[in-house]
Amino acid sequence: HSNGGEIEMADTITVFKGDGIGPEITDSVLRILDAAGADLNYEVFNVGAAEYEAHGELIPKEGYASMEKTHILLKSPITTPLGKGFRSLNVTLRKKYDLYANIRPAKTNSAVKTAFENVDIVIFRENTEDLYAGVEEMIDKDTVHSIKIITRRCCERIIRAAFDYAVSHNRKKVTCVHKANIMKMADGMFRDIFYDISKEYPDIEADDKIVDNVAMQLVMHPEKFDIIVTENLYGDVLSDLVSGLIGGLGLLPSSNLGKDFAMFEAVHGSAPDIAGQGIANPTAFLWSACMLLEHIGKNDVAAKIRKAVDLVLEDGSVLTPDIGGTATTIEYEKAIIAHL
């Protein structure tokens, strides 16, 4: 599967139910997808801490077999089991499928009161290298050497992914965010490759900004940004900053793309404190599912769902407790389906 170029029509997707509120929001989202006419088959697996307690593995073997076949994962929140020797499932999947692009859209909506009204930013964060490659050593007992790795291959693919997304989603501008004034070689290369690739996309405006300036601009004039493409560390920080602009992580979807694998999930965690109470908000996970639909070319279905959610949020009479209402997950889900 690729975001933009040759799109395979996938009608079977792998779904991980996860921990905490994961199973509840998964059930709701799959029912909404069906009601919207998404026309998908689901291979659903219980995954996470509970699965590990029961069977000694985070992901059942059948789950891996399913992903090898479908190349698409819709993943609800998962708790990493406590104890030594556990990488988070995301790190495991990122390494296994070389998920090089972390994509975080942040868009204001009427349900959450924030200081800004028309934020609509998508951050493309390189997911595999930079300082996060984890190459560190103690030179002596008082000195650590930490290495920043930037490669042409990884720069090219994240930058191309951002421009392809701009084309397929009718966006106008891509901004390269860097610190090339200080890291002239590493970030200089990232910026230079950005402008080289931008020439292949004459209809998309391309500019670059220094990361500290971007942090300031984002909290003053976030509406001036469209798509941001950046390295791993800057992307990690800026994507959470942008989340704060629109009221926090609770309503944010994300996707992780590899060359032939894509994973879609909500940014929020498994919220064990409200699990099983039937009041979880499925919106972020639903929007993650909309990103999945767009990825496989079902843009019309995604648009229909987004519109229905917007109408329910605007109406404001059927909202879950986290966004100021008293509705249950099921009531909220039914309101969305009624607006389809």
Regions found by a protein language model. Give the residues of each.
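Glycine-rich phosphate/diphosphate-binding loop of Rossmann-like nucleotide-binding domains
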Residues: 14-35, 140-212, 224
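Buried hydrophobic packing segments
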Residues: 29, 33, 194, 285-293, ...
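Buried hydrophobic positions in well-ordered alpha/beta secondary-structure cores of metabolic enzymes
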Residues: 19-22, 71, 124, 162, ...
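Glycine-rich phosphate/nucleotide-binding loop
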Residues: 49-51, 217-317
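Short, Lys/Arg-enriched N-terminal segments with co-localized hydrophobic residues
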Residues: 1-8
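N-terminal glycine-rich phosphate/adenylate-binding segment common to multiple enzyme folds
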Residues: 52-148, 233
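Flexible, glycine/charged-enriched surface loops at secondary-structure junctions
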Residues: 41, 169-178, 201-209, 298-306, ...
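N-terminal beta-loop-helix "entrance" segment that forms/cooperates
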Residues: 40-61, 218
